[in-house]
Design a protein with these regions (language model features):
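Alpha-helical structural context detector biased toward long hydrophobic helices
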Residues: 1-20, 24-253
C-alpha cells in the first residue's frame, strides 16, 4: 500500500514527532480484535486477507497532519468518542450524539488527508523564515505553525489547520444527528478504512464492535443478517485501501 510522499523527520526523531498517524483510532480497531489481539484485514493493494494488530502501519497515514492536531484537538475528540463506545449500553436519551458526530467526521477527514496529494501552500507577498530542520521540528513539537522562505506553509501543517476548520464547518452545517445503536442478531460487522460521507446514498453509520453500529437518525434496534449484509457491502464499497473485521467467517457480504 503506497501513500503520497511525506516530510520525513530527522534521524532518530529527536523531538518524538508522530509519523505514523492513525486514520481510525487504534482503540476503535481494538474492539474488533480476536483472542490473539489481531483483526482480519483485506488489503486491497495485494488483494488478500491478512492478520494485523491495531497499531499496524496499514491503519496509519504518514505524517498527513501536524503534531498540534495529533496531540491536541484530535485527542480530545477521540477521548470523548471512546467514552461513548466504552459505555455502549448508555440509553438513547443519554447518548452524547455530538461526540459521535465529531469523531465520525474527524475519521473521514483524516482518511481524505491520508490520500490527498501533498503540496505546500504558498502565499503571495508573504515573507517566510529561514529555519533549520531542527528549528522547524522544535516549533512543531510546541504547537506552532510557520511559513518558510522557499517552501511556504508545509503541507502537514496546513492539513492540520484545514481538518480543524472543515470539522467545525461540517458539524455546524449538518446540525444535530441522533445516532441510534443497531445490534446484529446474527452475523458481524465489517469496517471500512474510512467512510467518504453520503456518496453511496446511505445515512452515515459507524461500526463500533462486531455486533454494534451507530446509524444516523434512527432508533436503537436489532437487525437481521440481511441488514448486516447490506451494511457490510456498503463498508466494502466505501473502503479505499482496506476493510477489516474480527472473523471473516461471521461477516455476511
Amino acid at each position: 500500500m503506497t501513500q503520497p510522499n511525506f516530510k520525513r523527520v530527522q534521524k532518530r526523531n529527536p523531538h518524538q514527532l508522530v509519523v505514523d498517524q492513525h486514520v481510525h483510532a487504534a482503540h476503535c480497531i481494538r474492539k474488533f480484535a480476536d483472542e490473539k489481539g489481531t483483526v482480519a484485514v483485506f488489503d486491497k493493494s495485494i488483494s488478500r486477507w491478512v492478520q494485523r494488530k491495531p497499531d499496524a502501519a496499514i491503519f496509519c497515514a504518514k505524517r498527513a497532519w501536524d503534531q498540534r492536531s495529533e496531540k491536541g484537538y484530535m485527542i480530545s475528540i477521540e477521548t470523548a468518542f471512546f467514552n461513548v463506545i466504552d459505555n455502549i449500553n448508555t440509553p438513547l436519551t443519554e447518548r452524547r450524539y455530538d461526540d459521535i458526530s465529531r469523531y465520525y467526521h474527524l475519521w473521514r477527514l483524516r482518511g481524505v488527508a491520508r490520500d490527498k496529494e501533498r503540496q505546500n501552500v504558498h502565499f503571495n507577498k508573504v515573507g517566510g523564515h529561514r529555519l533549520t530542520i531542527d528549528e522547524q521540528e522544535i516549533l512543531e513539537k510546541n504547537g506552532y505553525s510557520f511559513i518558510l522562505e522557499n517552501d511556504g506553509l508545509l503541507h502537514h501543517l496546513a492539513s492540520g489547520i484545514e481538518i480543524q476548520v472543515m470539522l467545525a464547518k461540517i458539524c455546524h452545517d449538518m446540525g444535530n444527528i441522533k445516532w441510534g445503536l443497531l445490534t446484529a442478531r446474527r452475523g458481524e460487522f465489517l469496517v471500512a478504512d474510512y467512510y467518504p460521507g453520503d456518496s453511496f446514498g446511505l445515512e452515515p453509520f459507524i461500526p463500533v464492535s462486531p455486533k454494534h453500529a451507530f446509524f444516523a437518525n434512527t432508533l436503537d434496534s436489532g437487525i437481521d443478517v440481511h441488514q448486516v449484509r447490506e451494511l457490510n457491502r456498503a463498508s466494502i464499497s466505501s473502503s479505499g485501501n482496506y476493510f477489516f473485521c474480527r472473523t471473516l467467517e461471521k461477516c455476511p457480504f
